[in-house]
Every structure is written in C-alpha cells, then in structure tokens.
Amino acid sequence: MAENSESNSKNVDVRPKTSRSRSADRKDGYVWSGKKLSWSKKSESCSDAETVSAIEKTEVPLRSQERKHSCSSIELDLDHSCGHRFLGRSLKQKLQDAVGQCFPIKNCSSRHSSGLPSKRKIHISELMLDKCPFPPRSDLAFRWHFIKRHTAPISPKSDEWVSTDLSQSELRDGQLKQRRNMEEVSCFSHTSVQPCVITSNNSSGRGGPGTDSIVNLASNNSIEDSDMDSDDEIITLCTSSRKRNKPKWEIDEEILQLETPPKYHTQIDYVHCLVPDLLQINNNPCYWGVMDKYAAEALLEGKPEGTFLLRDSAQEDYLFSVSFRRYSRSLHARIEQWNHNFSFDAHDPCVFHSPDITGLLEHYKDPSACMFFEPLLSTPLIRTFPFSLQHICRTVICNCTTYDGIDALPIPSSMKLYLKEYHYKSKVRVLRIDAPEQQC
C-alpha cells in the first residue's frame, strides 16, 4: 500500500499553483489563473518550472528584463514556457493566448508590420519630384504616393499650354482660373464650351514679373491628349459632337461671345394715376398727414392694443404708412401698390388687397381677420388739428379729375405739380431693345 501511494504521488502533480507551468493553468479556461503576477515574476516562475520538468531540459537565459521590451524575446519566452503547444502559431496569436485578450492588439497590414511608423514629415520639395525619393514599400513611400494620387497632377505636356518660364505655383493658379472661367461660361449657355487656360508670362516692365496674362485657347484634341482634366470634366465640357468638330477660330468667337453677356436697353412704360380716394382719406380722422415714425411712436406710446394712425410715408416709393400698437410695441407697415391694388404685401397673392386705401383699413379692423404678422387697426387715433385750406382744395380737385387732366387745367405749372403730388405709377409694359453693335 505504501508503494502504491508513493507511485500515485509521483504521477499526480502536487506542485503549488505559482510553480506550475502556464500550460497546466490553461486547463481552467483562463490563461493566467491565480494571482496576477508581473512579467518578470511570471518568467521567473516559468523558468523554475522548466528546470524542474524532466521533459524540457533547455536552459532559460537570465534576461527577463530585456524580454519585456522586445517582441522577439517575448516570442522566445512564450515558446520556451508553453512548450510545443504554440509551435506554428504567429506572434499575434501567441500574445492573444498569453494576455487573454485583455489588451486587444490592433490589426496591422504587412506594410506597417515591418517596424514602427516613421515620424519624419514629407517636404514639399519631395512632393514636386516625379519619382518617389523614398525606399519602396516604406511608410514614407506609401504616404508620398497617397498624396500624389489625391492632388492635381502636373502634365508633362504642359509646355504646349503654357510658356517655358512658368513656375509650378503659377501653373496650379492657371488651372484654378481655368475651372473658374468654365463655371462662369457655363452659366450663360447650355451647350458645351472648349476650356481655356489662363497663363502668366514674366515681363520686365514696370509691374514686375507675372503682371501680364495671356489666354491660350486649346483645341479639343490637345485636351483629350493631356491629363490636366479628368474624364468627367471633359465629358461635361464636351458633350456636343458638333462642337468638337468645329474649327478652332469658330470656337474662339463663340467663347468670346459667351464670356460677354448680351446687353439690352430696357424701356419701361408707366401710367401715372392719382390716389382714387384721396378725399375720403383726408376726411378720415385717423389720417395725420406728413409725419415720421418717431413722432408716430410718441403719439402711440401707452395706447391699447390695436390703436393706429395713417400718415404719409417717409420713403419716396410709397405714399402712405400705418403705425399701430401690437404686442405691446409700436409697429409700422407700408402700404404697397401693384396693378392698381393696395395691400401690405403686394408680392404675396394670399395677402388681402383692395382697390382703395380706405377699404384696406376697414378690412384690418376685425381682429379675427388679421393674421399674427399683419397689422391690427381696430381703434383709430383721432387727429387733433385741421388741415390747411390749400390741402383740402387739392383733395377736392383731384377727386374730380385725372392725372393727365391736370395738364389741361388753366392754372400755373407750379400748382399743377402741387396737385400731382399724391399719385402713383403703375407699370404698363417692358420693351427690351438690343444694344447696337460696337465697331472697333
């Protein structure tokens, strides 16, 4: 019995947890069971276990501190500590098995796995070179090709387009000006237009180098051969086959015509009309005559909601304005005229309009008929002074005649101008006359 117990004790691993190898601890489902030890302590415990074990007779070098900072030493440590279980596995898999996915390792491509990425910056002079100055398959070479792919290429055939003394920066400016001109030209016509490149020539004049600019017009064949524009830009600029087959001089003339928009002489005919209800306006007690908005605000200060007054507008394009109290404030609204109708917004057909001003004021007396943005004219502010006899006579005369009928009255011209003061003009027609051709 004693011998059997001794033989069983030899077969059973009775070593403490800390002295076991990691392969024995992995049976629990966790890589490092027990206490969480540092890398140095783990390597020491693993090395002790390996020396005790009769299967693995290799010696472990005493360089555990250097193994923490080197990926190759970590791989060697994992191979010695874990035995034949990790043979044939990559470094990433071994680290994942060892750490237990506590620290996820970022996927790296083969391009970046050669070493740590370089922190060196690419100089602008290196980007101007035609060939990559960096070693192939390096990080700097990858960045150099990436930047070159996402920037505008410089065509080797650019000598046909620009002069030989043009610098690289001036060439890029010319390309930007070319695209800007194409956008401006495309606004005037739906047909395609051949693009033009604006180049700068160095001159020895007073303005210094780069002051003169020449517009070189290229044919479609040279555009197709050169790689300055992408295929999409060529398709959008050259959609018409007839346009491509035209001679160069015809294309040049059409470009010059499209660059200068057509000019027209516009003649607008107006009809002048007197205010239709000037007499009723003058008899209305809410009409205060000539008054600016500051005087109106002083009169309306402290008045209840809906109090209003009618006055002459301070702007020449409008005849009358209303000042009213709403939302505890003094507000102002101009009365506009369009097609012999008066409203507070002549360009909106949904806003109420009336053929006379008195009818417009009557409509906005009802609060239920007023929108929140429209004036509320429920309580008129009574005028406290009478008008002059001259003004009253003018309203009576204008009520009996028309604007053209005033010219037939046997009165002085100064009085005719005084009678025509309250009038508006309505647009009748618009005539567009072509501009005469300019002869050089």
Curated annotation (Swiss-Prot):
**What is the protein name for this chain?**
Suppressor of cytokine signaling 4
Q: Kindly give the CDD domains that the UniProt entry links to this protein.
A: SH2_SOCS4 (cd10385), SOCS_SOCS4 (cd03738)
Where does the SH2 domain start and stop, copy by copy?
286-381
Task: Classify the source by domain of life.
Answer: Eukaryota
Q: Which Pfam families match?
A: SH2, SOCS, SOCS_box
The protein's job, in short, is: SOCS family proteins form part of a classical negative feedback system that regulates cytokine signal transduction. Substrate-recognition component of a SCF-like ECS (Elongin BC-CUL2/5-SOCS-box protein) E3 ubiquitin-protein ligase complex which mediates the ubiquitination and subsequent proteasomal degradation of target proteins. Inhibits EGF signaling by mediating the degradation of the Tyr-phosphorylated EGF receptor/EGFR.
Functional pathway: Protein modification; protein ubiquitination
Domain SOCS box, which positions? Answer: 376-425
